Every structure is written in C-alpha cells, then in structure tokens.
C-alpha cells in the first residue's frame, strides 16, 4: 500500500484544489516543487524552503546516483537525512537526464547505456536499476523509468518511444513492488505532441495502475499551444482521484494555464536559475536587474512582497551591484525572492479555486502584466 493519500477538495472549471498526505507531511495542491538536483536547492537552506512555503521538493536520481553515490546517501538513511529536509521528496527516474545526453547514450529494450558526464565511465540504467536507486534514496514519490520522446518527432518515432516507455512502465511497476517499496509510484504519459498517442499511453498506464500520473515530454521545445492541446485532451481522460504532475514546465504563465487545464503538481529549475542570471519574477512581470535603469533604483524587487529580500530592504540598485560583482549573495537573495513568488502564486491559485474565483484570478494575473488573457477552451470550464 502506498504511503500517499490524495484528496480532491474543490474544483473551479478544470482547476483542481487538493491535498497530498504522506507520513512526513502534507502538500497542498496545486503545488510547485523546488528542484534540488544534487541534493540541494541552489543557494537556499532547507529551513528557508519551509519559510518560503515549499512543502515538497524534487531530487535527481541520475545525478545523485553518479555523485555522491548510493553508499553515501544510504549512510544517512536516505535523501531526507542527507539533505536535512523533513518534508516529502519526489525523485525523478533519470530518464530525462539520459535523454539529454544525446550522442553519449545507446537505447535498447533493456535500458540505456551512457557515458557518465562525471568521468566518462560506461553506465547502464534501466527500469529495475532506477527503482533500486530510488528505493535507497527513500523518496516519497518515485517516478517510473521512461524514454522522453524527442521534439520534434514523427508520429512513428513518437509511437515507438511511447510503446517502449509502456513496456518500461510495467517493468518499473514490477520492480517497485518486488522491492516492497511503499513510496507512491507515478506513471509518465508520453506520446509527443500527438493526442492519440498520449491517450494510448494513458490507457496503458492505467491498465498497469499507478498512484499518480505525470505528463512527460512537454518541456523539450514544443510550443505553448501544442502543450495546451495535450493538456486539454488528457484532462477529461485522467482519473479524478489521482494527482496529475506536469514535469519540468515552469514559467508563471505556464503554471496558471496548466492549472486551468487540471494540473496539480509542477517542478522547474527556473526560479533559482533565473535568479542566478539576474532575473526576478514579480506580479507585473520580470525584473531584469542587469538593465542600467536599476543602477540607482532604491525600491525592493517588488514593493509589498513578503520575501526575505524585499522585507529586508535590499534594493534593486544593491542587487544589481552584487550581480555585477558576481557576489553569491545576489543569487541567494534572488532565489529567495523567486521561490517566494512561485509559492505565493500557487497559494493564491489554491485560494481562488476554493473560493470559486480562479478565472477572475487568472484574468487579474494577466492584466497586472499589461496583457490580455489568452482564450480558454471549453474543456477548462469542465470540472474533473
């Protein structure tokens, strides 16, 4: 029996408000998961993540397997003890990272052989290996091992990739169960930008049975409209009583539009990566702190913001100075602000769904940026 319980608490159109319950904590959905690739969210302490509103974080199976290795993490009792994070952790399977290696990998029915980016050594990773690694990591949500369908891809290529991922999904399920792992196991829907293939993938995954369903392969270069078509197609077909996770998609606009199409969970490196590159998210758009107009700007990043950087009185001029001098404090303060913005955005969407005002919230979200809200399809007004 999985350690995860999911409760759907409210809907507003297709937008869903729910709760994930684990022995180590609860997660309110829609939820954004900060990414801790190497066992840390860059420039942010675990305790600060809690203060920012994060309730679940993501760890990277592929990178942690290569460095520091499973023995070191096992010495700490798993990833929670290693990271000093007491809340829930989701680990990806390593499939996307292997996909990103491009010319340094060879895919077979059994799995993937690749040259490790750390030392060039030949490494094999398949469904069984991924499940064993994630068992040692002791994460609360385990992802199946899949092949991330490339973009662009012909329908034949996307079909072959999707069918391989389905066979790997069954092997992941079998291996996970054989390990007697009570962590939740999520399936990953593939099929590229072809709705019928996505539907076949979902049907196959539901026949196997999973605790949640992720939508993979939608952060690899496709257009926003192509992504939305897939979300709109899947929304009425996904089981209502299982969480839905859109992998790797993370602009604020993407989060709002995906919540409007029924998504519950998100992850992305964007908040911290953009902070390290001098870009700060606000309700009125993005502050690009390297622009000369901020050289003597004594306002905080966003007046009225409750993050430590803004409440602390750090000005745009100061942050620009730190950034230009490559001071790590710029990355720290910017990451705190961006993660606060993301977690607050999710909290505001949750409150709006509960109140039945999500589409009013969505309209205001765009107006604050000086934009007209994009049109919504009929599916977004259908509960599920």
Swiss-Prot record:
Descriptive protein name: Queuine tRNA-ribosyltransferase
Question: Mind telling me which SUPFAM superfamilies this protein's record contains?
Answer: tRNA-guanine transglycosylase
Q: Which reaction does it catalyse?
A: 7-aminomethyl-7-carbaguanine + guanosine(34) in tRNA = 7-aminomethyl-7-carbaguanosine(34) in tRNA + guanine
Has the keyword Signal been applied to this entry?
no
Which E.C. number(s) belong to this protein? 2.4.2.29
Q: Name one GO biological process term.
A: queuosine biosynthetic process
Function statement: Catalyzes the base-exchange of a guanine (G) residue with the queuine precursor 7-aminomethyl-7-deazaguanine (PreQ1) at position 34 (anticodon wobble position) in tRNAs with GU(N) anticodons (tRNA-Asp, -Asn, -His and -Tyr). Catalysis occurs through a double-displacement mechanism. The nucleophile active site attacks the C1' of nucleotide 34 to detach the guanine base from the RNA, forming a covalent enzyme-RNA intermediate. The proton acceptor active site deprotonates the incoming PreQ1, allowing a nucleophilic attack on the C1' of the ribose to form the product.
Please give the family membership noted in the entry: Belongs to the queuine tRNA-ribosyltransferase family.
Q: What is the lineage of its organism?
A: Bacteria, Pseudomonadati, Pseudomonadota, Gammaproteobacteria, Lysobacterales
Cofactor requirement: Zn(2+)
UniProt keywords (A-Z) are: Glycosyltransferase, Metal-binding, Queuosine biosynthesis, Transferase, tRNA processing, Zinc
Cite the GO molecular-function annotations of the record: metal ion binding; tRNA-guanosine(34) queuine transglycosylase activity
Q: Which residues bind Zn(2+)?
A: 305, 307, 310, 337
Native source organism of the sequence: Xylella fastidiosa (strain M12)
Region: RNA binding, residue numbers: 248-254, 272-276
């Amino acid at each position: 029996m999985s350690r995860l319980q999911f409760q759907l608490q409210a809907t507003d159109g297709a937008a869903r408000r729910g709760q994930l319950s684990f022995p180590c904590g609860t997660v309110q959905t829609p939820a954004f998961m900060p990414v801790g690739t190497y066992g840390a969210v860059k420039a942010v302490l675990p305790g600060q993540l809690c203060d920012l509103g994060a309730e679940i974080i993501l760890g990277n199976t592929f990178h942690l397997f290569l460095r520091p290795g499973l023995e070191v993490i096992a010495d700490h009792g798993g990833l929670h003890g290693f990271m000093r994070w007491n809340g829930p952790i989701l680990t990806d399977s390593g499939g996307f990272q292997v996909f990103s290696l491009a010319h340094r990998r060879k895919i077979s029915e059994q799995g993937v052989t690749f040259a490790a980016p750390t030392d060039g050594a030949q490494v094999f990773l398949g469904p069984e290996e991924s499940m064993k690694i994630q068992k040692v990591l002791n994460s609360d949500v385990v992802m199946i091992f899949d092949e991330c369908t490339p973009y662009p891809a012909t329908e034949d290529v996307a079909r072959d990739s999707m069918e391989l991922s389905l066979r790997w999904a069954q092997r992941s399920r079998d291996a996970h169960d054989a390990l007697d792992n009570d962590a939740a196991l999520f399936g990953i829907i593939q099929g590229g930008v072809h709705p019928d293939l996505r539907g076949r993938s979902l049907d196959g995954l539901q026949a196997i049975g999973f605790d949640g369903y992720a939508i993979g392969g939608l952060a690899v270069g496709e257009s926003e409209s192509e992504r939305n078509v897939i979300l709109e197609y899947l929304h009425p077909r996904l089981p209502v009583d299982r969480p839905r996770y859109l992998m790797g998609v993370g602009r604020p606009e993407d989060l709002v539009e995906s919540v409007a199409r029924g998504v519950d969970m998100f992850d992305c490196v964007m908040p911290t990566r953009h902070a390290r590159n001098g870009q700060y998210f606000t309700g009125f758009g993005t502050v690009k702190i390297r622009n000369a107009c901020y050289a003597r700007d004594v306002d905080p990043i966003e007046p009225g913001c409750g993050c430590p950087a803004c409440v602390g009185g750090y000005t745009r001029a100061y942050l620009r100075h730190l950034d230009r001098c490559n001071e790590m404090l710029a990355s720290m303060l910017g990451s705190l602000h961006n993660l606060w913005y993301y977690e607050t955005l999710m909290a505001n969407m949750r409150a709006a769904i509960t109140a039945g005002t999500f589409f009013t919230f969505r309209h205001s979200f765009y107006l604050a940026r000086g934009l007209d809200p994009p049109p919504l399809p009929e599916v977004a007004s259908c509960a599920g």
